[in-house]
């Protein structure tokens, strides 16, 4: 997974996450400052947000992670965040040095969503 510069090649990870379920829409790996390190939209899907909105949203994801971290000592670390919207389901997973942001179709049952979260965590433990 690492190249000559000891950096992890994120493309195979993002592609692997996107292939977990056919109803996956978008996967982004975000650094702790909110910059998109790698992102892929599933072929045939269109973004519900413009590129500028997507970048702004990723900055907000990083900011919310910082805010949630303030409560780690009293409440424990966040395992993942699951947001249900009318048009899309959003999931955010927090590996150590990156944040994984995923969108999927909203019509997936809860049990399958939990399976997807577990698979994402397994694929991103090294991040």
Indicate residue ranges for each PLM-predicted region.
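Non-catalytic interaction/Regulatory regions outside core domains
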Residues: 1-127
């Amino acid at each position: 997974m690492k190249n000559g510069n000891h950096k992890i090649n994120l493309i195979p990870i993002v592609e692997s996450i996107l292939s977990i379920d056919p109803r996956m829409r978008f996967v982004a790996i975000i650094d702790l400052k909110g910059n998109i390190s790698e992102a892929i939209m599933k072929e045939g899907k269109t973004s519900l947000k413009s590129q500028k909105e997507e970048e702004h949203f990723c900055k907000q994801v990083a900011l919310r992670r910082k805010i949630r971290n303030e409560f780690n000592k009293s409440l424990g670390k966040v395992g993942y965040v699951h947001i249900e919207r009318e048009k899309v389901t959003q999931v955010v997973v927090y590996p150590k040095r990156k944040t994984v942001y995923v969108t999927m179709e909203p019509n997936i049952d809860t049990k399958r969503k939990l399976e997807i979260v577990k698979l994402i965590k397994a694929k991103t433990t090294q991040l």
